[in-house]
Amino acid sequence: MTRILILGGTGEARALAAALADVPGVEAVSSLAGRVRDPRLPVGDVRIGGFGGADGLAECVRAHPVDAIVDATHPFAAQITRNAADAAHRRGIPLVVLRRPEWSPRPGEHWHGAADLADAAELLPDLGTRIFLTIGRQGVDAFADLQALWFLIRAIDPPDVAMPPHSTLLLARGPFAVADETALMREHRIDVLVTKNSGGGQTDAKLDAARALGIPVLMIRRPPLPPATETVDDVAGAIAWVGTLTRR
């Protein structure tokens, strides 16, 4: 039996868990960080909660042995990816990172790149005054000192950090339709969209809406992966990678 630890919390992680449940000789357990109050649970065994850093993750895979780790977390979950690489190296087990392809600007789109949240906050005052902030609830405090701007902040759960003084919080979970995103931006007179380059096989609805309305996008670039990290682009690639383990 090949035992796989899936570091999850994304749609790809749920799809991978469901697919591996039907593969003979493979047993997968999914781990969720527990940062969302009502997470969408994957098929199969699930653990919820952090590991306590790389040391805790290494101890977890020692106490509950696995043959490999698939990191299918969000592309911006940089710390857990570093921890996974560290723990896998210590335990001498293979790791693959499932990273969906990045988005790229299309004709008619107006993108401005930011290295991280702090860089985005510094660039934002020169781009507009009514901001649609779609980075999730973590990191909202990077914009808390921008008192001259107004923000529409969308997140699944309320932020537990400082928020910009002039802001409206919209609690909602996607996916969203292009027509709804367009109407939302028009209603709130949005003139800049701030988002992360989460990527995926299809363009996000908010990017399509911003393009249609001629609204510039401040796109936060992904953090780099640990050196020499093996990656796959999609669930099919992750399944094929697991298949190489079962044939060893």
UniProtKB/Swiss-Prot annotation:
Q: What is its EC number?
A: 1.3.1.54
Give the highest taxon in the source lineage.
Bacteria
Which reaction equation describes what this protein catalyses? precorrin-6B + NADP(+) = precorrin-6A + NADPH + 2 H(+)
Its keywords, alphabetically, are: Cobalamin biosynthesis, NADP, Oxidoreductase
Q: Which residues form a coiled coil?
A: none
One MF term in the entry's GO annotations: precorrin-6A reductase activity
As given in the record, the signal peptide range reads none
Q: What family is this protein classified in?
A: Belongs to the precorrin-6x reductase family.
Spell out the protein name for this chain. Answer: Precorrin-6A reductase
Task: Name the source organism.
Answer: Rhodococcus erythropolis
